[in-house]
Amino acid sequence: MAIVKCKPTSPGRRFVVKVVNKELHKGAPHAPLLEKKSKSGGRNNNGRITTRHVGGGHKQHYRLVDFRRNDKDGIPATVERIEYDPNRTAHIALLCYADGERRYIIAPKGVSAGDQLIAGALAPIKAGNSLQLRNIPVGSTIHGVELKPGKGAQIARSAGASAQLIARDGVYVTLRLRSGEMRKVLAECRATLGEVSNSEHSLRSLGKAGAKRWRGVRPTVRGVAMNPVDHPHGGGEGRTSGGRHPVSPWGFPTKGAKTRGNKRTDNMIVRRRK
């Protein structure tokens, strides 16, 4: 993995910083694990915009990633290759199981082609192996953590993400997340050892607006640049600061306002995030 700063041969190249990984597979993805991915342009079935700043971008296929790994317990797998996935910040690994089946998983950091991985209670403590939380030693770094047994990984799935198992108490274990939050999770939930690959993702710089458009991201217009009919911050004579605390176009507080409202799982949070 190398960080490459491009030479300023043009204005669009001047600020480009790329993350180059020579281990990534250069060919086509595994076709049986691809699915069609339709673009909505941020519109719903009425044609109205429900998600702003979405539209255009390169065509993509969705890669079917196995977030459970619970039906392959005890079956060893060989990592065939590490691949780029346009649908997520992390890389993905193509596994070939001893029974001949191939599946994609989130690629853990340090795992490369040729490595042997396995899931199940008897799996060794090694990056990329999947176990129930009750079988993972306290202090271990993990990712791809389930919140409900059998539902599949939900916590720590993006590039460079991880959590730490810091305590075990009865049917629960306590995890420390990257945000600083400490929360309880059922010990029968699964997790994968190690941290997610491509931790250098945050160091890249796209360099120009067009690179965002290739990814299907449209421009964001500031509220203070709009008219009063379009945004609470709009209007005014000359340039203004908006005249109130930052809000969304619909008047809800933004830029730091807390939005969590899931009281049902409040008792699972030992310490709120920082």
UniProtKB/Swiss-Prot annotation:
Q: Which InterPro entries match?
A: NA-bd_OB-fold, Rib_uL2_dom2, Ribosomal_uL2, Ribosomal_uL2_bac/org-type, Ribosomal_uL2_C, Ribosomal_uL2_CS, Ribosomal_uL2_dom3, Ribosomal_uL2_RNA-bd_dom
The protein's superkingdom reads Bacteria
Annotated coiled-coil segments of the chain = none
Keywords of the record, alphabetical order, are: Ribonucleoprotein, Ribosomal protein, RNA-binding, rRNA-binding
GO CC terms on record?
A: large ribosomal subunit
Looking up SMART domains in the UniProt record yields: Ribosomal_L2, Ribosomal_L2_C
* Any one GO biological process: cytoplasmic translation
Q: Which GO terms describe its molecular function?
A: rRNA binding; structural constituent of ribosome; transferase activity
The UniProt entry, under Pfam families, shows:
Ribosomal_L2, Ribosomal_L2_C
- Which portions of the sequence form the region Disordered? 28-55, 224-274
Does the record carry Signal as a key word? no
| Purpose of the protein | One of the primary rRNA binding proteins. Required for association of the 30S and 50S subunits to form the 70S ribosome, for tRNA binding and peptide bond formation. It has been suggested to have peptidyltransferase activity; this is somewhat controversial. Makes several contacts with the 16S rRNA in the 70S ribosome.
Matching PANTHER family, A to Z?
A: LARGE RIBOSOMAL SUBUNIT PROTEIN UL2M, RIBOSOMAL PROTEIN L2
The similarity annotation says:
Belongs to the universal ribosomal protein uL2 family.
Assembly notes: Part of the 50S ribosomal subunit. Forms a bridge to the 30S subunit in the 70S ribosome.
Protein name (Swiss-Prot/TrEMBL): Large ribosomal subunit protein uL2
The UniProt gene name for this protein comes to rplB
